[in-house]
Structure formats: C-alpha cells, structure tokens
Amino acid sequence: MSDYKSTLNLPETGFPMRGDLAKREPGMLARWTDDDLYGIIRAAKKGKKTFILHDGPPYANGSIHIGHSVNKILKDIIVKSKGLSGFDSPYVPGWDCHGLPIELKVEQEFGKPGEKFTAAEFRAKCREYAATQVDGQRKDFIRLGVLGDWSHPYLTMDFKTEANIIRALGRIIKNGHLHKGAKPVHWCVDCRSALAEAEVEYYDKTSPSIDVAFRAVDQDAVKAKFGLPGVSGPVSLVIWTTTPWTLPANRAISLAPDFDYALVQIDGQAVILAKDLVESVMQRIGAAEYTILGTVKGAELELLRFTHPFMGFDVPAILGDHVTLDAGTGAVHTAPGHGPDDYVIGQKYGLETANPVGPDGTYLPGTYPTLDGVNVFKANDIVIELLKEKGALLHVEKMQHSYPCCWRHKTPIIFRATPQWFVSMDKEGLRQQSLKEIKGVQWIPDWGQARIESMVANRPDWCISRQRTWGVPMSLFVHKETQELLPIERTLAAMEEVAKRVEVDGIQAWWDLDPKEILGEDADQYEKVPDTLDVWFDSGSTSYSVVDARPEFAGHAADMYLEGSDQHRGWFMSSLMISVAMKGKAPYRQVLTHGFTVDGQGRKMSKSIGNTVSPQDVMNKLGADILRLWVASTDYTGEMAVSDEILKRAADSYRRIRNTARFLLANLNGFNPATDMVKPEEMVVLDRWAVGCAKTAQQEILKAYEAYDFHEVVQRLMRFCSVEMGSFYLDIIKDRQYTAKADSVARRSCQTALYHIAEALVRWMAPIMSFTADEIWGYLPGEREKYVFTGEWYDGLFGLEENEEFNDAFWDDVRYIKDQVNKELENQKANGIKSNLEAKVTLKYADDANGTIKKLKLLGEEVRFIFITSQFVISEQAGGIDDENIQYNAGNTTVQAVVTRAEGDKCPRCWHYTTDVGKVAEHADICGRCVSNIAGNGEQRKFA
C-alpha cells in the first residue's frame, strides 16, 4: 500500500476558513428575526435574577455614526455576558423624539408652524419625521448584531410615555421642587428658546474687552474710606467686561470682601481696583505714571454707590465670592438678568433682575434711545461709543475667548432673564440628597463620581421650560392676573386628567383642551401655560416613564446606565435629578461611561477633515463582528481610536480566533460527546493540561466580563488562542490526532479536550463576536439548544491538580524549554535541517534542582512528540555546561539543546524519521508505530 492518506484522521469541517462576514451576517440576522431569538432568550431566562441595562435614548435624527455603534455594542456585550452569567437581562432600546433638531428639520422642509399650516399639523409632521428616523436607525442598530426588543422599543413620543412624563412632573411638583422665576437662562436667539446646559457648546469668539469707570456718587465718602480726604480729582470704581452689550442691565458692582483694593492716582483722577491687578491694569490702559495712595478691604466699600456711565441711575458696590483675580480689575460688572452668578448675588441684595433684551436678541423699546431694536451682538460698538462720549471708557481692545454657542446653530447665545419654570436644587434639599445618592452608585471609571459631584454641587436650578412647539406640554394652569399656579391639589388632579387624555391622543390633546373641561367655572380666571418641557426632562424621566412601566422589568430599578462621557452633564444628570426629586433615590446602581472616537492620529472625527469612519461602510466591507471586536479590544475609558489600519488589525485578530475555532471543529469530525468522551482520569496528561488551561482562561475572562474590562477579555482570548493553544498544544496534538487509530483512547482523549475547549471558547466569544459564535455553535457536535445565547458559561472544564507530578508548573517549564529548543531548531535550518521532524535533539543538562528533567525523562518515548522532533535524547553533563550555551535557567536547572540530523528513514504516513521503517513486510514503507495504528492495537499515549 503506497497511499496511506485514507488511513489518516484528517481534519474536516464545513465551517469555512474565511468569515465572509459582510455576506453571511445578514442571513444570520434574518434567521434570528424569523426565530424571534430575543423572545427565545427571554423565555429561557425567565425567573432568573434580573440585570437591567437601561438604554439612554439616542436622538431620532440622522444616520447612526461610529459613536452610536460603540455605545450600542458595549451595551450588547454587557447584556449578552450577563445572560451567560445566569441573569435575565432584558434590553429595551429607546429613542428621544421631541425637541428642537426635529423641529428645525421639519421647518426646513415645510416652513414654520403658523405660516403654511397649524401648530397641530406641524406636530404631526414632527411625529412622522421622528418615526422615519427611528426606522432608519433601528435597521443599522440591528445590523450591528445588537439583540433587543426592536419590535417594541420605547419612544419618548409614545402616547403612554408622554403621559408618564407629565405624571413625573406632577410628582416633582407634589414634592415641592418646582418654582417659577425670571432667572437668566441660556437663550438662543435663533431658536428663540431657552437651552439646557447640555445643549451649549463652546467655541472661540473675538469680543471687545473694555475697562469702564463708574464715578462715585459721594466722592467724600469714598475718599474717607481710604482715609484720604485730600485726594485731587474725581474717584471712580473700574470694571472690566467682554460683553459691553450687557451694560444697560447693570445694577451693581461686585467686589471680593477679603481682597485688598487700591486707590490709584492717574492723570488728574483716582481709580479703585484690586491691588494685585494694579500693575497689569496700568499697563493695559497705558498709564505710564501712577501712584497707589492707599488700600482697604473690599468689605469696607460695600454699599457705596457709583453712577452708571450712561443709564442715568446709580448702582451699589456689593460683595460676592465669585470675584477672582484671574483677569480684569477685581471689580465685576453685575447684571442680574444676564448671568447666573449675577442673579444669585442680585437676589441676596434685592437688586432688580432687569431684562432689556427680547426673545429675538434685540433691545426692547425704552432701553436707551440709540439701542432700542438693535441686535445685542451689533450693539457693542454703540455702547463703546456711548462710553467714550461720557468719558467713562479707560481702554478697549479685542480679545479671543471661549464663548457659549447653540449646539444646533453654532451661533453665540446669551444669558437672558425670562419667566421660566425651574426645578429647585435647594428648596427641598434636592442638591444634598443627590450628592448623597451619588456616593451609593458605582461609577466606571471611578473618576466619574468626582465629575458629577462637582457638577451637582455647582449647578444652578434646572430650567425645565421651553418655548417650543414639538415637546411634552408642562400641562399647567396659571392665574391670568397673578400668574400663580393653580392650587397644588387641583394642579395635580388637572395634570392627571391631562395625562389620561395624552395617553389616548398624544400631546396634541393638551393643545386641543378647553380649560373649562377640567377647571369648570374657574376656567375664566386661569390660562394654559404654553411651554413645553426640556427634552432632557423627557429622557431623564425614563426611569419612571419606561423602567417602572415596562412589564419585562417587573418593577426592578435599572442596574446600569451606559453612555458617553459627555452625559455626566446630560442624561446621567437629568436622570439623577428627576429620580431623586420623585423618589429620593438614584435611578441607577452602576454608571459606565465611554470615551469619544478619534482617528488613528488622535484627532476628533470631523467631516471637514474627512477622517470619519462610517459603521455602515465597515459592516459592508468587513462585517459587524470586526466592528464589535474593535470596540471590545479598545480601552473605552479613554479616547477610542479607529481608522482603516486599526480595523485591519482587528480583522487580523479575528482571523486568528476564527482559525483556532476552525481547527477545533475540523478535529472534532466524527466525535460524538455522548459516546466518545473520555473520562478526565483516563485522558492523556497533556490533554487534561489543555482543558485546565481553558479553565484558567475562563476564570480570568469571566472576571474581566464582570468588571466590564472587555479589552482584557480580548487580550486573554488572544493569548489562549495564539500562545497556549496555537503555538503549543494544537501543534503537538496534530500527530496523535491524525495518525492514531480513529477510536483509540489516545485520539478520543485529544478530541475530548478539543470538545471541552470549543464549548468554552464559543461562549467566551458570544457577547463580542456574536455572529461568529452563532456560526460555530451550529457546527459543534452533540445535542444542544439552538442558540448559544440562551445558555450559560460552560461548566464542564477541569484541570490538573497542583499535587500531581505533571502539574501546571511542570508544563510551564516544558513550554519554556520548548521555546528554547525551537530557537535552536530555527538556527539549524541554515545547516540543511529544514523541518523539526528531520531533527534529533539532545537536551544536555548539568543539574536538575527543580526536578523538571527527571519528570521529562519519565515521559519516555513520548517526550519527542512534545518537541515535535523525530528523536529526543536527554543527556546529563557531569562536567557542567559552558555558560555561553545555557539556553534555559530556572530553579538552578541549566540545559543546552544540540540539534543533529535524525537517524533512519522518513515514514511517508507520519513523516517521522525512524530506524524501523519497512520492518513489517505487509507495510514495507512505513514505520512500526504506523503499522500498529493501521493494523494492530494502536499506540498507547499516557503523557502527550
């Protein structure tokens, strides 16, 4: 017999070598949908302990970008890993559907409400637009392999959710947190609406920087404070500002109580400013000669009055902790209608909250003759000219600084005092209770705690009212004359009645409502509040409107919120505020934040730079599993770099993992775990070591999943596939797997190990490379559920005992020695020994302090299979080994590998060189071992 191929157990599997993910994944998705995989998982996990990851709703506008993909994939990895950990982890995706961006899109296409159609028709078009956006994004999220209740997501525009948002506000009102006030809020003149903190972005802007003198009303009183009654010339207090347009609203000048303020003589007049800033101010205003006449603490100047340069009234000097020495003069222009710090101190001193600016950003009539009707950003030059005319301008220059802008229009915004509704941070202790609750939450990474604590500690009251058309109505009634809210009990009853109607007909029910239907005879005295709720209230109240309401959550609170790091001031904040205001507790147990995506050079993604990466393109070219593997392998706690090159590296890693899985499957051909499994105690020692290796890897992988360290999962998975399996175990077993008798213990032991490893590996992969894990699952032998996602981590792993002779420590030493032997074998290729099986290795040793060599000797003939050489001899060197040739030194054991050409002839069946080829007449061209494996009882293997 010259062709022995038919006698070999060659690997065979239908599992393709190439993933072809972009082509195969859509077919798998179709099967998942047809089978209702999400429903199957829910049924399988019913009754288990719950883990609820509550989805922060993306905005229903535009196609998904790479940041969306990162977010949804991270969530999916957690949900799937929790399922494998024995939890029932339902995932209900959501969308944020109200608000300005959708209004702008509809306006661009159809015009503003009231122009070509009614507000009701406009809302209907907004609802229709949002629904189409949801459908588009949903398809892309599903294509990512994210499992969830995509047929029944939550939308903030669902009638029931809209009704529950109104009920959430009612609970907050009941708990005493709502108040009305004319406070300065971020105002976009293009939106003509207040903006939330999270809707404000900062860009560089050039503004005029001016120093302005406010002359003292009672000159003698001011001079007396400094103990200098004889000062010549008028005395003024100097302020500095970069917003000259706010000067008409000035109502005070703020000083720091503990700073030293100097009276400085210049050019026939005296000016007051912070002593530490005198030198820089004098340089700025060009005063070459000046004299500091005296100093006093800021507190000494409190309530002295100074004349406004052009408004015709005088203003007091007041004391505030917000005054700094970072820039300016140490005297702060204070306009309570145009800044939160100014407002707070204005309230303390009973100042007027003047608001001379209309919603369109122009001065209201009666402000000042040359300013009435002028846009505030065009008014700076007019104000500067006024100051020059009045002799009050000491200096003007241009400066570039960071300025707040609208997130949609990218145009500068203003602080503007308008009648708005606020959730009070302090009236009922919301700030303190929130800070207390923050400490009970696990923040991942842990720096998130300090970040949100700082934000909560310093944030102003939350302005929740908006002057928009497309949003959830506040559903409040106020008295026509006093503007007071309807008495509390009646307010709550009215809100519940409105909520019931909204639950049936949506938010339009509020605008269609005749107040008489609810208020009866009192309707003539009250009017409906036209404001809608801030969209951050919509999404922030979902712990109540969605989590508490959905039956699959069974009344459990959310375990985790997971979003980008910008959401500390966004969704994490609004959710915390609302939950604490409603229930007195945080809405989440854990909060995980991920960084933003950047390109390979660390630059922010930008269409103008052209460095964006489209998730749709990646899925169409490489497949979703490559995108998922990139997300998992990147440390999400910092910026997440992505580029074609980085994705190519992810694809390379994927191939290594896939090749390992394919090797396992191909060598499980013909293996039936029900009949062919070998008991652990009867297995070859090396096979038990391999299963133990998987057990150790699984412990570390599960620990990493539990800690949400997914890049650690991928690294450990790669080490297992490439190092422990690929470069050691899988190479060694090829000879035994291919050449031993098909049903011998030697081969079945090996297959048993491969089976256990494959069962574990496919589960480790499932949360990350979900499509590939599903594909592998379909090729694994043995009875099993239809999907890997319905089960749990594999519990059939075992390993070597520490007290065994050939324990893990021994195999660690063997692997090290093998690495050194392989280096010498590589060196000998230049001398004509082209393959390891052409070699004979003599392992020389001088001592054996840790007993490794003694154990190697006990392996007998089988030691050569570990080193994949035809012959392997161990030789003691009584005279010691030359230090230069030491290749292994651990525990005082030193060895040297000497490689020579193997003796004998090559066996065409097993490719080993041996001296007994042709010794059996019936099989004259093969070795004795192969004869035994073909025609005899087969070789016995105990160790390798």
Curated annotation (Swiss-Prot):
Q: What is this protein called?
A: Isoleucine--tRNA ligase
The entry's ATP-binding residues are: K607
Cofactor remark: Binds 1 zinc ion per subunit.
Entry similarity comment: Belongs to the class-I aminoacyl-tRNA synthetase family. IleS type 1 subfamily.
Q: Please give the record's comment on domains.
A: IleRS has two distinct active sites: one for aminoacylation and one for editing. The misactivated valine is translocated from the active site to the editing site, which sterically excludes the correctly activated isoleucine. The single editing site contains two valyl binding pockets, one specific for each substrate (Val-AMP or Val-tRNA(Ile)).
The keyword ATP-binding appears for this protein:
yes
On whether Protein biosynthesis is a keyword of this UniProt record, the answer is: yes
Identify the coding gene: ileS
Q: Which InterPro entries match?
A: aa-tRNA-synth_I_CS, aa-tRNA-synth_Ia, Anticodon_Ile_BEm, Ile-tRNA-ligase, Ile-tRNA-ligase_type1, Ile-tRNA_ligase, M/V/L/I-tRNA-synth_anticd-bd, Rossmann-like_a/b/a_fold
The organism sits in which domain of life? Answer: Bacteria
